[in-house]
């Protein structure tokens, strides 16, 4: 479900993957190791949810996602499949705390879209610099230009760039 993927992406925002996994595991523990539905999140104490290691901003974003899901304002899995990438980005970035990177993670990992390049992802830019032995960091705009030649498989390139140690 897009709802689950959005919440997971919010939890992982701006964190090292190990830290994200630890916080996500504690988040699930609060809900008996099952991904909670929107109603369960809205009924749970905010203090309890935040105790898994979430910042106040991430907590508020998760509560807003759950609220929009409960009010049927988020597309279903069937509806979202029919939407274009730019439509999905536009829709979800209206939620406070959900930026383009968060939606791109949903597009890549939940929807399996193959032509997404998270230009603002620092690991992608640093690892490209490392791979090409460039003396200076590259900008989001530069990786956007470079990645045009990788179409229609920019998501695949992203996976490989994330995998560089």
Question: Where are the predicted features?
Answer:
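C-terminal accessory module of base-excision DNA glycosylases/AP lyases that mediates lesion recognition
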Residues: 73-75, 85-86, 100-165
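Alpha-helical ds-nucleic-acid-binding substructure associated with the helix-hairpin-helix region
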Residues: 15-16, 20-94, 149-151
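Helix-loop segments that flank and shape redox-cofactor active sites
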Residues: 2-3, 29
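Amphipathic alpha-helical segments that form the core helices of the histone-fold
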Residues: 6-8, 49, 147
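Buried hydrophobic packing segments
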Residues: 7, 62-65, 128
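Hydrophobic (often cysteine-bearing) scaffold residues that line and stabilize catalytic clefts
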Residues: 3, 7, 15-20, 58, ...
């Amino acid at each position: 479900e897009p709802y689950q993927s959005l919440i997971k992406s919010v939890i992982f925002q701006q964190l090292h993957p190990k830290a994200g996994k630890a916080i996500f595991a504690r988040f699930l523990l609060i809900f008996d190791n099952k991904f909670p539905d929107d109603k369960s999140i809205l009924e749970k104490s905010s203090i309890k949810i935040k105790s898994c290691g979430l910042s106040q901003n991430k907590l508020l974003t998760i509560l807003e996602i759950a609220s929009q899901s409960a009010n049927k304002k988020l597309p279903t899995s069937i509806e979202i499949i029919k939407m274009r990438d730019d439509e999905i980005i536009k829709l979800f970035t209206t939620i406070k705390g959900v930026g383009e990177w968060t939606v791109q993670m949903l597009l890549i990992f939940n929807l399996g879209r193959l032509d997404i390049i998270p230009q603002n992802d620092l690991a992608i830019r640093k690892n490209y610099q490392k791979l090409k032995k460039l003396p200076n960091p590259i900008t989001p705009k530069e990786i956007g230009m470079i990645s045009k030649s990788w179409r229609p498989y920019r998501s695949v390139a992203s996976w490989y760039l994330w995998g560089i140690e």
